[in-house]
Amino acid sequence: MAYSYTEKKRIRKSFAELPTVMDIPYLLSIQVDSYEQFLQEHKKPKARENTGLQAAYSSIFPIESHSGNAELQFVEYYLGTPEFDERECILRGSTFAAPMRVKIRLIIKDKDSKDKDSKAAIKDIREQSVYMGEMPLMTANGTFIINGTERVIVSQLHRSPGVFFDHDKGKSHSSGKVLYNARIIPYRGSWLDFEFDAKDLVFARIDRRRKLLASIILRALGLSTSEILDLFFDKVKVYKGEEQFEIDLVADRLRGEMAQFDIVTPEGDVVVEQGKRINARRIRQLEEAGMTKISIPDEYLYERILAEDIIVNDEVIARANTLIDHELLVKLSAFEASESIKEFSILFTNDIDQGSYIADTLRADSTSSREEALIEIYKVMRPGEPPTVETAEKLFDSMFFNADRYDLSNVGRMKFNRRLGLDFVDTDDADIQRERSVLTNADIVNVLKELIEIRNGRGEVDDIDHLGNRRIRSVGEMAENQFRVGLVRVERAVKERLSSAESDNLSPQDLINSKPVAAAVKEFFGSSQLSQFMDQNNPLSEVTHKRRVSALGPGGLTRERAGFEVRDVHDTHYGRVCPIETPEGPNIGLINSLATFAKTNSFGFLETPYRRVVDGKVTDVIEYLSAIEEVGTVIAQADSPVTADGALSDEMVSVRSYGEFVRMPPEKVTHMDVSPSQVVSVAAGLIPFLEHDDANRALMGSNMQRQAVPTLRADKPLVGTGMERHVARDSGVCVIAKRGGVIEDVDASRIVVRVNEAEMIAGEAGIDIYNLVKYTRSNQNTCINQRIIVNQGDEIAFGDILADGPSTDLGELALGQNIRIAFMPWNGYNFEDSILLSEKVVKEDRFTTIHIQELTCVARDTKLGTEEITADIPNVGEAALSSLDEAGIVYIGAEVDAGDILVGKVTPKGETQLTPEEKLLRAIFGEKAADVKDTSLRVPTSSKGTVIDVQVFTRDGVEKDARARAIEKSQLDSYRKDLKEELRIFEEAARGRIGNLLDGQKVSGGSGLKAGTIMALADMKDMSLETLLDIQPVEEEISERLTQIAEYLVDKQKDIDVKFAEKKRKLTAGDDLQHGVQKIVKVYLAVKRRIQPGDKMAGRHGNKGVVSRIMPVEDMPYDEHGNTVDIVLNPLGVPSRMNIGQVLETHLGMAAKGLGEKIDGMLKSQAAIKDLREFLDKIYNQVGGEQVDLDSLTDDDIMALADNLRAGVPMGTAVFDGAKESQVKDLLELAGMDRDGQQTLYDGRTGQKFDRKVTVGYMYMLKLNHLVDDKMHARSTGSYSLVTQQPLGGKAQFGGQRFGEMEVWALEAYGATYTLQEMLTVKSDDVEGRTRMYKNIVDGEQYMDPGMPESFNVLTKEIKSLGINIELKQTH
């Protein structure tokens, strides 16, 4: 394979045996594609599909006035350019959004016209562009910047619209009878439920309201009793014979039934005796006897149901749905021959598989007409309102048959039709979709029929947790729904005003108020449950957050109501949702992560890729299947053995079919997994040897990787999985080349690339400039910084990584550090998962992290006057002001400690009334110190660091202070310098290209050159750019290209002028601050944190612990070569946790390090390049796994590769396709180590050998964002609760340590009376006692004088509130 610029610098040895069938898809596509589909900003208005904003506008417009005389039509929408870019929005605390304008057409019609829809009826047309508010834009990395913070909209997994059949599992009724139900769930609108009760009557509910008999709904649809019976039942004709009634012999209806009477042939032979079951043999006998009818006794007809009215001489003898009894049969037999009833029909029902449920329900129904049914429904939906037939009809129609109120959606219609076995053809036609989005009478009847079929034992209920019944609602769809809500509010207001549009001569601008739309959008992005503050700890946490799928949120589940089933792993999760990565705690199973290869289809269902298998042969065709499409397929595992021509070689292949793991012959296999890692998510896919870890620990491992803090120097994992590169690339933290070329210029903050000729656009200078992000604060206060990994003159290609971001090393994710560890107990310092650390780790800054804090000082208008930011602060010494400038703001670079002033601020304070003399003195001497108080911004307690940046924002109209002007000037100078440099680079590039074009060309004149002169590069060296552009070559094509370059440079100059003017306008203009705010100063503090006891660390296998002690290097255990161990872990942490992956990682890490040391030795001894190639070939190509084509690398490449492998050869052991034990041992041997991976260690303090050999190796350890500095604090005195007067709790409130009732019991048990008294009084809520104690300490008297605790007063007040008087009496 061809390696990219960064990949060939350090090749990861892969142990994968299986070929790569498809690359991992772009990891953020679920976010980016969804929002792109919503906005469609890059498509021309006419080419836009009916989705997202387009669909929202189309569904609301046209809006017609009540009279029909005016109409508002939607033409198109377009998005402007955002006022500030992403970086400026974060600094200013504003939203990254673009203004949206909509072209609206107002049509006024002639009031007197008969046909309002004809062209002749149109009186006036007014078209106008209307501002519809700001629409937040998504950044390239799938995030939104809302009020200056990066947020992510998490996708929601909700129940798909459609029809669902279920039962109550026998829990509803005391008898334990299983009651079936059906539910029609629309995308938008009223829910319709049908359910059985214990008596087998069918009921309906609308929107979970009071129950109605299902027959009421059927009658409301306009069906009569006989029509309902015809729809739901088969009929049996009953003929009146000479002696007995007879029925037709229908074999299928008799099979399996118990004979209620003797069935006799015409000859008198008994074929079936009474009480015997009628089987297939007896039916055959009846048919052979030539019988078409069976004689039945009268008793057989008792309790049977009439299928239709019996009418004799226009008189109704019996109504349809009447139960036949003896009386009715006598009445029927009594008629004379002329008027006799020769036949009538009954319903075919039985107790086995043909229940009379609908007939029984009809009999219980008191309504007899459509009108009565509608009024019944109205009473349930609008209790207390007087019903009329018109309003009832209108309500029922609007609930299920009106597209404005009810939307089953395209997905809902597809699910509905599929479930009921009806045809569904997907279409983009908006009119057909709208037509299909409402229910029809047939739909409701079909649902009831299916429910009754299930109750009759035919058909199955649905599995609600099947991923075919749950779909993903991504950011675009949720934004569209919210936008539509806003538009509906606008529609209501517009309809009111439209009627007066003509008389008041209104324009579309006057009619439409965009505030409801803007408010709806703002609410969704700002405060929706699914709009979350982005987890920006490291690149992995960003990617995982964007790929998260939540079952919570609006329209979803709640934590309290969600049961075990919905949280559990379902077999349809395979390849779609990760079975490992989910939070521990109340959200377990409700918040999931997408599997590595999963994507959503057009209906919102999750799909996973499979290779097509035809006749036992695996093809290269890749099919994405949703959980619905997967039903009935037979899927082989990715590691199933395959021959060279692609045939499955095993006689019986291990497959998945209908959610079960079974073995089948190759001919039956239809699909095959694309990769063993398609089951897991990105985070779980980063755990090496995951297959050897217990699932619970793997869950912790994948969650804790997201909490790793980016270290000062990123260090790639020696033992990885090969997924690291994909995460780093797709997370967006690295700088990736947009086009190939040569690195022209590079410094710490910028990379300049001269683009390849082939990738250039005609006429451009062919330069790409990449500006790097330097020392920026993330959402979690970690440091975002990009470092270049290319050098001047390097050749790069499209997609190469030019700069590493936080936690990336040469384009690979690097969350922690490779640390030399030993598994052994050490003096109890690694008891209970504690971690013993060597001082060497601290010295080398291995786990040193930089945290950036943003501290804000706001100067407001108060009632007493304006707050002022100044260096003139009352009662503050010179030393405290030493780091401030004349404007009262700290210098950049100042090192500050807890309590130091960062921004000086004074606030006016209300004073007592001054005497006239004092007023006079104040007027003369201008003494202000007395009327202001110090409210300066200080460094918080337990913090210290370096000021790395200051930003000053001043309200528009308020004069800027000296510091604000200085910042503005430096930013403008820096920007001007950048632009000048940019232009210089472009001009130089243009010079180079002109030189190449003119070299060897004949000229016809220009620039003082004679016609016919042949140009040479040497002659052009000293010519200015203007001179070069004046040259007129003979060849026309060259002349045209010169003209293009000249035009491009002119455009570039104009572009740079415009950019500078725009930047200057933005910087010099005042800032749009909140009401009452005059000035905001933001100070950024960089805090360097070394690892220390109390910090939490973890490996990738859920092996977490807290640093217990940092030992001197000389006391740590060491091996026979004198190499000390960096970390000592407790071996007892492994067996019970069953995460053996960490031991295998340790061994493989040791081999990787040993091989690196061997390479280092070869480089130091200046071994021949041939020997180096041979050794690398042994590592990469002779231990198994993926082969590396070292011959394709030049000698320089090999040297660069070897240089990068000195610290260890990185290994890639992919999930479920990783290194085998034998391969690990072979590598240990190749590195010159024992195959068992153990070493003899010596005690650093005594020099004595430990009794047994110890497992020593390299493990990748992470420092988690649970730092002791953020958690630990101490309180002397501080704030108290207002009511109880007890100290507050928590670091944020500077609170105290709680002394609870159990601790009180402990003191009681010890009889420590004085300590107990102190705890319950002066150290808690005895207000007077603690004041006296303070006085005593000041006076030097060491005694305590306790009083009455305030909580006792609270108790007495509570008792008094119950009406019981309680008084305290002092007795001496």
Curated annotation (Swiss-Prot):
Q: Name one GO cellular component term.
A: DNA-directed RNA polymerase complex
| Ranges in a coiled coil | none
Which residues form each disulfide bond in the chain? Answer: none
Molecular-function annotations in GO:
DNA binding; DNA-directed RNA polymerase activity; ribonucleoside binding
One family name in Pfam for this protein = RNA_pol_Rpb2_7
Q: Domain of life here? A: Bacteria
Matching PROSITE patterns: RNA_POL_BETA
Q: Which InterPro entries match?
A: DNA-dir_RNA_pol_bsu_ext_1_sf, DNA-dir_RNA_pol_bsu_external_1, DNA-dir_RNA_pol_su2, DNA-dir_RNAP_su2_dom, DNA-dir_RNAP_su2_hyb_sf, RNA_pol_bsu_bac, RNA_pol_bsu_CS, RNA_pol_bsu_protrusion
Please give the catalytic activity noted in the UniProt record. Answer: RNA(n) + a ribonucleoside 5'-triphosphate = RNA(n+1) + diphosphate
Which Enzyme Commission numbers does its entry carry?
A: 2.7.7.6
Q: Which GO terms describe its biological process?
A: DNA-templated transcription
Return the broad EC class.
Answer: transferase
Keyword annotations for this protein, in alphabetical order, are: DNA-directed RNA polymerase, Nucleotidyltransferase, Transcription, Transferase
Which family does the record claim for this protein? Belongs to the RNA polymerase beta chain family.
For this protein, the record's NCBIfam families field holds:
PRK00405.1 (NF001616), rpoB (TIGR02013)
Question: What is the role of this chain?
Answer: DNA-dependent RNA polymerase catalyzes the transcription of DNA into RNA using the four ribonucleoside triphosphates as substrates.
State how it assembles. The RNAP catalytic core consists of 2 alpha, 1 beta, 1 beta' and 1 omega subunit. When a sigma factor is associated with the core the holoenzyme is formed, which can initiate transcription.
Record protein name field: DNA-directed RNA polymerase subunit beta
- This protein's species is Psychrobacter arcticus (strain DSM 17307 / VKM B-2377 / 273-4)
